[in-house]
Structures are given as C-alpha cells and as structure tokens.
Amino acid sequence: MGTFGDIAVFSFHDQKNMTTLGEGGMIVVNNDRFVDVVPMLRHNGHCNFGMEREDYWLPAMGNLAIPMLEGTQIWPNNFCLGEIQCALASELLKRVDHINVEKRKRAINFIDSLSEQSLLRFHRVDSERHNYHLLVAQVSEGKRDQIIRTLAHNYGIQCAVQYYPLYRYPFYQSVGFGDAFCPNTDLFFDNMLSIPFAHSLTDGQIEFVESSIREVVESL
C-alpha cells in the first residue's frame, strides 16, 4: 500500500471493506518530504522543538506549529484514532485480502445472475484489483425510482442513491460552484442505484436481495 504517488489515503468508514468501528482512515507516505507533515496534521500541529534539550520537559513537553506542504500552510486538526480502533484495524488488516476476494466473488456472482435483465447495467470487472466496495447498477427507461420504491415498500430492501454531485448541493451553489456542466455525471446519478452489499451480509441475505431485484424488474 502507498506505492502509488507520494501520499495514499485509505478510508475505514463502516461501509468500507475494512473498518475501524464506524469512522477512521490512514495516510501512507512514499516521499521523505512529507514524512514530518502527516503527524502534525493528525494531532493539532504537535511537533518537536527542533533543538537539543537538557531537560525533556522544558520549555514544554511538545511544540505546536502549522504544517507546511509545498510552501502552503495547512491547518491541522485532531484526526487521531483511539487504541481500540487501531487494535481492530491491525487485526482486520490481516484479513483484508480474504475479505476482498469474498467481495469480488459475491459481486461477480450477483452481476452474472442478473445479466439477463436488460433494465440493469452493471460495471463488471474481472481484475483482482477491483474490490467492489459498492455494488452499483444503472437503470434504463427511467425505472430507477420505481424499482427502489418497490424494493423498500414490498421487500424491506433499501437501496441507496450515491453520491449527490457536489454542484447540485445548495451550499456549493451558494458559493459559486453550481454552474458545472457534467451531462454524463447527471445521466448516471439520475439513473443509478446502489445495492446493499456490506461484507457482514450473509449469503442468504445476498441471495434474497438478488431474487427480490429480479422479481421487481421482471414485473415492470
């Protein structure tokens, strides 16, 4: 990990393949220029005084500074993970390859089982580098909302719509980012659905989701 580019960022959100009890993340640095910056960003700008000290507690236990990255100041914050979260992550890291293999296998089986449904278009990737964090389908003929509504009301399955383009949010529109012209993004977002696909789901639950989607699509 971390060999692509100078800095690699990993999310450990609860819905990711590897999690740290809800929230968390990791930064991996592959460039010595940034090694001292990351710890400062993580913990409120804490750093050493940069001088030899006869007494380790004087003038204080630690210094504070604003991290600099390529000549630009970056305001730090408290992004530290707790000990329990780190302990869990350390154990899950040993299993993440197995988890990814399981996710890929489930995703390919799911996609292939619905391949005859012309209303649904999946992005099927055979590469072992694709971990299927999300299982997403694009729905044709404007049937997306009808499918989501029927799955939720009749089967208790809540699909999601992810992720709202930033330029559609009123907040970003209010600060001048609402004029973006992204027709492909709009087309995809307005016709996509994200299928429940957490690693914690059992094989039976995954099969129920798949069969329910088939029933709904074939009824349209």
Task: Show which residues each predicted segment covers.
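Conserved active-site segment immediately N-terminal to the catalytic lysine
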Residues: 1-21, 36, 68-71
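A conserved catalytic-core signature of glycosyltransferases
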Residues: 22-23, 84
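PLP-dependent aminotransferase class I/II
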Residues: 30-220
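Short, well-ordered alpha-helical segments in soluble proteins
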Residues: 16, 25, 42-45
